[in-house]
């Protein structure tokens, strides 16, 4: 009995302490915060995040409480931005204030203590690595020069589809392999030996990094950090990642050259690592973090977008017919179409934009407010975590008619681009931290998609109809399909 009473006393003491600390923190906040749902002691609004994907749940909250909403998640204060107006103010007007990232256990472990480009803080290291990435890999000139790689890997994919004619094929798997090969050859000069294992690690890491980890939401609690079992799982994954990347980098050091006959971006990073005048030294972990960036942002997002585009076209057969008619007319007689050729495909561009509207590669964009400021009349305290709900903005009826309907024709009436100029449609982000690889990514979506539509007609397996298609998403930073896309390709014969 004495033991039971002791435990009750301890629990009451701990809860009382946590509640008092919660009230003390709340007293330090400014009075003009964004609207907020009712919260519970200690956990704040954590209970509201149950029962769905984060972007879906957060959309429901902002629909009820306003496009700018304040949430207390454990000890951490967050603000959700779900309108084009608030996002424009944060990412354009106040861009330097919101250009930072916040730390998480997942990014610290898998992205080498954020010594990469995607999760790096807004500092000299980030500016330096981004500049190298854009100039050496992602410039429009380089994107065009990678045309022969896209053509080569597309030819492989077409052969795979041809060999499966009349039979069901896992299109998701084959498209991912193609995307992976294009990125590896363009960035590193060759296909990685353990490319498949690395791709699996990327999917697993992106899935785990997309959720809310309790240890991240209670940073002062050493106990939750100790009991964070996902941390130990991530550390094991990091060990596997190190084995793959260390082996690749050792091979890279002894090889003479890649397929371009000169330096690739890894060579450039190694050369600059020796430069003593660099503002921020480039470490070996920084190079590995960059490689993981290229894989996670370059392969998974492009492959996912192609899969969603094909899924939406299969779900909407009349749109499929229109897209195929345009592609087959404009590309007729062109054996190896690339970026310049697909520029003529107006409806295909609309299909891709509509896909990115409904299925953005980054449904939630994380930022950190560096200093206290004001957004749409509300005070945002310094160090507040920001979540830009790109998925919700793309489905907002204030900007889009019939927002949940796949309708590429809407872009005949509404002129909006996807490169960060129009804040109603920002699948690649905006401002200083807009995705540097967006032109590379778009080329790796549009060219393969055009060829898949040109060469094949498609059916669903068994007795499935378009209405039966599962369009569910699964947790992940890139918003992937819950289930793989299974299709039956039939070779298109223009003379039939």
Curated annotation (Swiss-Prot):
pH dependence remark: Optimum pH is 6.4-6.8.
Membrane topology: Single-pass type II membrane protein
InterPro entries, alphabetized: CYP450_71D, Cyt_P450, Cyt_P450_CS, Cyt_P450_E_grp-I, Cyt_P450_sf
Biotechnological exploitation: The monoterpenic phenol thymol is widely used as a fragrance and a flavoring ingredient in food and cosmetic industries. Its derivatives have also several biological and pharmacological properties such as antimicrobial, antioxidant, anticarcinogenesis, anti-inflammatory and antispasmodic activities. Medical applications include the treatment of disorders affecting the respiratory, nervous, and cardiovascular systems. It may also act as a growth enhancer and immunomodulator.
Effect recorded for residue 156 to C: In strain: cv. Tc
Cellular localization per UniProt: Membrane
Cofactor dependence: heme
GO cellular component: membrane
Residue numbers binding heme: 435
EC numbers, comma separated: 1.14.14.-, 1.14.14.51, 1.14.14.53
Keywords tagged on the record: Heme, Iron, Membrane, Metal-binding, Monooxygenase, Oxidoreductase, Signal-anchor, Transmembrane, Transmembrane helix
Pfam name, any one: p450
PANTHER family in the record: OS06G0641600 PROTEIN, OS08G0105600 PROTEIN
Protein name: Cytochrome P450 71D180
Species annotation: Thymus vulgaris (Thyme)
């Amino acid at each position: 009995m004495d033991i039971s009473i002791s435990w009750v006393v301890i629990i009451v003491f701990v809860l009382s302490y946590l509640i008092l600390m919660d009230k003390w923190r709340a007293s330090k906040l400014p009075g003009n915060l964004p609207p907020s749902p009712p919260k519970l002691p200690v956990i704040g609004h954590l209970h509201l995040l149950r029962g769905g994907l984060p972007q879906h749940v957060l959309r429901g909250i902002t629909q009820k409480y306003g496009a700018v909403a304040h949430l207390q998640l454990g000890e951490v204060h967050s603000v959700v931005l779900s309108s084009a107006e608030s996002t424009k103010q944060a990412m354009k007007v106040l861009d330097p204030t919101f250009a930072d990232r916040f730390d998480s256990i997942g990014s610290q472990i898998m992205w080498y203590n954020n010594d990469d480009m995607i999760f790096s803080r807004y500092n000299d290291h980030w500016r330096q690595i981004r500049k190298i990435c854009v100039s050496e890999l992602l410039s429009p000139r380089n994107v065009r020069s990678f045309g022969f790689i896209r053509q080569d890997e597309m030819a492989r994919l077409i052969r795979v589809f041809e060999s499966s004619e009349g039979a069901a094929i896992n299109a998701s798997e084959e498209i991912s392999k193609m995307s992976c090969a294009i990125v590896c050859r363009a960035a590193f000069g060759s296909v990685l030996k353990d490319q498949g294992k690395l791709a699996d690690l990327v999917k697993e890491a992106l899935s785990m990094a997309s959720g809310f980890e309790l240890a991240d939401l209670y940073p002062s609690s050493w106990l939750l950090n100790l009991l964070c079992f996902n941390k130990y799982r991530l550390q094991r994954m990091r060990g596997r990642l190190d084995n793959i990347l260390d082996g690749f980098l050792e091979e890279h050091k002894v090889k003479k050259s890649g397929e371009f006959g000169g330096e690739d971006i890894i060579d450039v990073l190694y050369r600059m690592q020796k430069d003593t005048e660099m503002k921020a030294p480039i470490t070996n972990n920084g190079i590995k973090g960059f490689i993981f960036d290229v894989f996670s942002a370059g392969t998974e997002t492009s492959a996912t977008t192609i899969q969603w585009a094909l899924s939406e076209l299969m779900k909407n057969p009349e749109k499929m017919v229109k897209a195929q008619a345009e592609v087959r007319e404009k590309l007729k007689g062109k054996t190896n179409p690339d970026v310049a050729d697909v520029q003529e495909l107006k409806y295909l561009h609309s299909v891709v934009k509509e896909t990115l509207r409904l299925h953005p590669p980054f449904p939630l964009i994380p930022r950190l407010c560096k200093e206290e400021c004001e957004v749409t009349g509300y005070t945002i305290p310094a160090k507040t975590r920001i979540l830009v709900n790109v998925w919700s903005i793309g489905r907002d009826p204030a900007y889009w008619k019939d927002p949940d309907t796949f309708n590429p024709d809407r872009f005949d009436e509404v002129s909006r681009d996807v490169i960060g100029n129009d804040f109603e449609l920002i699948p690649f982000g905006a401002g200083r931290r807009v995705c540097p690889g967006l032109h590379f990514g778009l080329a790796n979506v549009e060219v393969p998609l055009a060829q898949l539509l040109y060469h094949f007609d498609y059916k669903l397996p068994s007795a499935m109809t378009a209405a039966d298609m599962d369009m569910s998403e699964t947790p992940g930073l890139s918003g992937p399909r819950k289930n793989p896309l299974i299709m039956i390709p039939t070779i298109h014969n223009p003379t039939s």
